[in-house]
UniProtKB/Swiss-Prot annotation:
Belongs to the UPF0227 family. InterPro entries: AB_hydrolase_fold (IPR029058), UPF0227 (IPR022987), UPF0227/Esterase_YqiA (IPR008886). This is UPF0227 protein Ent638_1623. It holds the Pfam family UPF0227. The lineage of its organism: Bacteria, Pseudomonadati, Pseudomonadota, Gammaproteobacteria, Enterobacterales.
Length: 180
């Protein structure tokens, strides 16, 4: 089973395309939708939904994936639910760059203070970060600086922020999922 979390643009047709691409790894791909506008509510909702899916799951090696803001949540929810994560161009600093897009971006900073301290150290090697050198929305080099101490970084030379085509990375994702 692969759980997919969309980014800030929840209505993007690219979400359906990524789900279809992920089905080449596992036919059981589940999209969880969330508001993107209420961080504390989103965290509670995502934890509940992922836990529910894991309770009914028969896959011994489930995976959670997310793009952009979905990558932010996939890393945290995956850690809390003890499943491996793949993040594409994760938005690691939503409290900085969601200003004006959502009502209370400061909730992201509050969530960070309530999370397990040093969670990335405890999550070491359980997340695969795929970053685009052509990300027009976020500074992928800044993300790499934070993540490379804990996770493998795979660089993509062509995709933009929304990562429309993940197919060149499917074999790597499949191998990562198999490690379970």
């Amino acid at each position: 089973m692969i759980i997919y979390l969309h980014g800030f643009d929840s209505n993007s047709p690219g979400n359906h395309e990524k789900v279809l691409q992920l089905q080449f790894i596992d036919p059981d791909v589940r999209l969880i939708s969330y508001s993107t506008r209420h961080p504390k509510h989103d965290m509670q909702h995502l934890l509940k939904e992922v836990d529910k899916m894991l309770q009914l799951n028969v896959d011994e090696r489930p995976l959670i994936c997310g793009v952009g803001l979905g990558g932010y949540w996939a890393e945290r929810i995956g850690f809390l639910c003890d499943i491996r994560q793949v993040v594409f161009n994760p938005n690691l600093f939503p409290e900085e760059n969601m200003e004006g897009k959502i009502d209370r971006p400061e909730e992201y900073a509050d969530i960070a203070t309530k999370c397990v301290s040093n969670f990335r150290e405890k999550n070491r090697d359980r997340c695969l970060a795929i970053l685009s050198r052509q990300d027009e929305a976020l500074n992928s080099h800044r993300a790499a600086e934070f993540l490379h101490h804990y996770y493998e970084i795979v660089w993509d030379e062509e995709q933009t922020h929304k990562f429309k085509n993940i197919s060149p990375h499917l074999q790597r994702i499949k191998a990562f999922k198999t490690l379970g």
